[in-house]
């Protein structure tokens, strides 16, 4: 029999398959299946650690290549070279052969050695350049330091030990002006010159002063331009210093302190002629180093620029290759037959495509032994695979955030496509705000391709749900027209059905009443009559309307959700769920809240002014229905025979409680006892035979779908475990279900009043914002009024977008999401499934965080 056509209404039919693949083409088969993205592989080596698996060495080799590619990327970022990103819509990567992967690994190794060598050379030369630059600054500043030092011999003398003072005086007395340059050596005074970071100068000076007890004379000057620190590759401000002291031990101590503080000490001659020669030598060496450095940098940048053209493609290729070997590690290896054996789940309708793909790989490899795929009969619960497209994907995602639907149950996302945005629109309901939202959604859809590349997380989240925003905006336009509300103002699209009756003695401040223009004729054709806006009883009327509408929408939402539980029970052939849960639950719910909705609609349809009667309150009616059955509030009837009808409905609702409570558990116990009496095992017991048991395994060379099957079952919906029927557990579960259902019928209905509350809040906030900005601006006159109008409109627009569209929109969306997750899904969805996660390259590229920076 041909398989059923897959529909979005429920998950696709799944089959467990067993693949027998020749070891020579295992990698190629995995590549082909990764491109298809239709097989969810099971781990057949769960007892082995990651290091014991067959292809661990290949993965480690690819990890090393990936590390090398990341190293290239870091060097490109350091050099400021842009990366050419991989565009999946334009660029096509053909599956590489093992030879091409080996060549890529060798090339990456060679390039890493070359780039590392160039990088080391560059860093060494850069460090040498900095040292020569610092030395030049020291030589340049040293002349001034020495001149000042010779002019302050008294200060230098005071900075030395008192025991040496007579010697210094004697030397000074015998020195002439011509001998001044050799006076330091003659006075046994030495010096240390160098460069230190500006942020360390103060600490450096304090340490020297305390360590040497003031026996030093220090000069320093700032280097005006920042110098690049090669260790951190950032500009650093530094100072030149020259410290004068006497004694070899003190000078050695100064050098040690300087080096410990991160200072660089340089050799400087105190004679100006020799210093001049040093400057010339340093300049020549610096120029040579800069030339070599420039050439090295150009070579390195050229190498990295060439790598940047292919790096993204290489990274994706290696990532795919790693995924292939990780998947191969899930396979079992039959050493006797040199065959890889794999098990997995795939959509039943896609089995022919998978078979043809395996055949194509076999034909390309030229193997005589075919790859075989056998469908296995199993009692394991298949994964849930819900096919989506660009439009439904976001809706499916918000449902999956709550849970994964049970295999083959009604897909909760299908009704959500309509109900979620519509309930949002009921709460949002402003025509003007909806138009702005609609324009934003259409813009995101129109410029879809360029906006897809935006990496800003918050925008990416909104962009992912662009079709949700679109549908929410369309429904909000509709509800805005129904409410006749645009930025808290009304639209006079049609003639009003009301007219004001103005008394002859009318004065400002008096209340004016309105009457129907044609009592038995014209009615406002669509939405809310604009005459209601601005009246004294506007809120009274609108609140009553929106409150009752919220109850009706909640009733409709929960009723269709209950109907889905009937569809699920029929599909899974569980009639007891229909008669034990659905029927009594539906009768209970409709006896109370279905009746309330009918009363609301009936009350709306009666011309109470024409009858001359006061309409009864429905809230009190419902309270009296439970507290005083057969009694009406104030004795006012909504319709003839109301008291009798309410008593009958209440009895009908009460009768359903024991049916809900006892029918299903006792029926299951009776069914179990009957089965045991006939000699069968208890309901829920199952037997399982491993798919890889050699005794039960058929010859894999046989191409029949079921000849290789080795999985047997006694329960179509089992999970492969032995479960005895326990009446106590079933009874407790049913008691909980009954209590929850009865209480939730009340609480969930009340929960829909949030539709009215948020709609009211949105309308009132919009009115306040208008009155605080545009209303005042429109009243102003003259040039100042025009300027104020521009400013007020800017404020009005910005605050409308931020507060009323974004903040209020998010609030309404979350409330609508709660109504879907809790009030609707609790009526029919089990969410007992597990997701279908196939081996797919496309999915890997979309979800990998590491590859995002390589894909554009």
Curated annotation (Swiss-Prot):
Please indicate the ranges of residues that lie on the Cytoplasmic side: 1-409, 448-460, 565-582, 669-738, 824-856
- Residues on Vacuolar side: 429-430, 491-544, 604-648, 764-784
Task: Give UniProt keywords alphabetically.
Answer: Hydrogen ion transport, Ion transport, Membrane, Transmembrane, Transmembrane helix, Transport, Vacuole
What is the protein's membrane topology class?
Multi-pass membrane protein
Residue ranges of the region described as Disordered: 689-710
Q: What is its main location?
A: membrane
A Pfam family reported for this protein in Swiss-Prot or TrEMBL: V_ATPase_I
One cellular-component annotation, GO: vacuolar proton-transporting V-type ATPase complex
The record's InterPro entries line, in alphabetical order, gives: V-ATPase_116kDa_su (IPR002490), V-type_ATPase_116kDa_su_euka (IPR026028)
MF terms from GO for this chain are: ATPase binding; proton-transporting ATPase activity, rotational mechanism
Where do the TM regions start and end?
410-428, 431-447, 461-490, 545-564, 583-603, 649-668, 739-763, 785-823
Where in the cell is the protein located?
Answer: Vacuole membrane
Feature: compositional bias, Acidic residues? 692-707
Q: Name one GO biological process term.
A: vacuolar acidification
Q: Which family does the record assign? A: Belongs to the V-ATPase 116 kDa subunit family.
Subunit field text: V-ATPase is a heteromultimeric enzyme composed of a peripheral catalytic V1 complex (components A to H) attached to an integral membrane V0 proton pore complex (components: a, c, c', c'', d, e, f and VOA1).
This chain's function reads: Subunit of the V0 complex of vacuolar(H+)-ATPase (V-ATPase), a multisubunit enzyme composed of a peripheral complex (V1) that hydrolyzes ATP and a membrane integral complex (V0) that translocates protons. V-ATPase is responsible for acidifying and maintaining the pH of intracellular compartments.
The name of this protein is V-type proton ATPase subunit a
Say which species the protein is native to. Neurospora crassa (strain ATCC 24698 / 74-OR23-1A / CBS 708.71 / DSM 1257 / FGSC 987)
Taxonomic classification, please? Eukaryota, Fungi, Dikarya, Ascomycota, Pezizomycotina
